[in-house]
């Protein structure tokens, strides 16, 4: 199975031929049959084929292109499957979104528009189609989707077949847990459409999935569900500091710090609000009101390193690559604006990890980990987590903390890491993000191409320069 780059052009032939293929491609595929099946996404038709000389373009009868809902005039890849005598165009990647505004064709996705433009730029350069759509845009019975694709510099609605794979970027946990979504995901599986990053991760589910795995347990802080006074009492008896975290929370929202002091107990929230209590009953009563019946977890407080009393953690982006294997794409240190959370969305800032580890402290016994250590831990935990969870995942934002003794702890795992442009630290001296595709966007598309049947080959390593022989 091999593929070649091409541009498909609509052309009304005078003969009965439906599809003209470059002669070089037909020789490469050893294609001699006068007819074959042409596929794009979920659509396929039989077509009569012939060859053309001196071109890498593919000419297609307009009625065939319309039956396939195949865009023309754009770079694509073509893959011939000899055992099925079929020609497949792609890769065709669908992105499931919560919403978009087609009335603003230059920025229909709001702050996520730059991300989608990056994806479209890569597709235009390497070949492929990207289509963003909502749940209600899909007609399963007809096998079509009405979504947004980029035409030039604007995004337009058009009808396409069901994609070869779907990347889940829904932002609503409630929508994702709906019966509609459950049925929708099952329809994807029934249609053999890879659907990755299947759902948001719950902190408790992550902890439960890893706590019984020997290779992961050493990196997990103690954690229990917050259900009663006894939970607070037991955790604060075992640990001087405990964090109450929303089980379904994100971006550092709703985190509360509980501390046992010589005078009683202290509760602190982001923003500087602090309250003291003489009894644990009073603390629990106030905490119960703050959590408002939402599922909360109690997590052991850790003596994490920081910079000038600013909490510091490390976000490691781990993604599946062009071979479907987990790999670390990027890592950044995040400094909190307050002493409770370090999330960038809550006013934090970023540093390169090497610089952060150099500036952070205090260290006990000089056991300072290296960035390579953090990468290795994040990679190991990602592999173990995917093995333990149901569903298909292709990227995790792994949040790690490092304590003063150099031990690495897992703080959180996010299956929908942010795609806004402010989540990567800029090189020193640069004030604006570079106008090139981020490695995370490239890797996501390479994995999507892989599951679509268009795995991208690695670039060959340059040969070492021949050594010059000195004449004596």
Regions found by a protein language model. Give the residues of each.
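Short Pro/Gly-enriched beta-strand edge/turn motifs at strand-loop
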Residues: 18, 294-302, 379-384
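C-terminal active-site "lid" helix and adjoining low-complexity regulatory extension at the edge
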Residues: 353-393, 402-472
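Phosphate-binding site of ATP-dependent enzymes
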Residues: 228-230, 234-243, 247-351
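Short hydrophobic beta-strand segments
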Residues: 89-108, 166-168
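Conserved N-proximal alpha/beta basic substrate-recognition cap immediately N-terminal to
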Residues: 107-231
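A short glycine-rich, hydrophobically flanked beta-strand micro-motif that places a catalytic Asp/Glu
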Residues: 131-135, 297-301, 313-314, 387-405
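Short, flexible/disordered intra-domain loops and linkers
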Residues: 101-112, 175-179, 421-433
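Short beta-strand-centered segments at strand-helix junctions
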Residues: 1-89, 97
